[in-house]
Amino acid sequence: MLFRSRKLRLHGGAKQYHHDVVGTNSRLDSMQAAVLLAKLPYLATWSERRREHAATYSNALADVSEVRTPVVDACNEPIFHQYTLRVERRDDLQAHLKSKGVGNAVYYPVPLHLQNCFSDLGYKRGRLPEAERAAGEVISLPIYPELTRDQVDYVADMIRGFYR
């Protein structure tokens, strides 16, 4: 019972990005709520900084054919909690960025239809090829508001250099 409860509270899995049951992220306690309340006045400024960083990345990487940047519809104003690219040779790029001191992450490396918690739906590998392809191509770049323009430019330069 304890193991199942822990899984339910951690998105449904004991291991990150591998879900055995459908769960939630329900770890907000009073202390975290107080901290978030204190940060709320800064949210608009932080969101604008993230949008600026995203625009810088997108502009710098626009002519790199191996990189697909996020598509932003003109009527939307994303916050860019993550800035996720789809790239060729993702694992090699990830290692390259790490070797250059650039943090990066692969969120959701296993598509939903291949998670254990959805196995009863009967989807097999190959059934949703675009989702599987995306899971193998996505990489997220640093996007936190405190980044400097020089740091964002450095990350973009490291990616451009990798694909030359």
Question: Where are the regions that the model predicts?
Answer:
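PLP-dependent aminotransferase class I/II
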Residues: 3-164
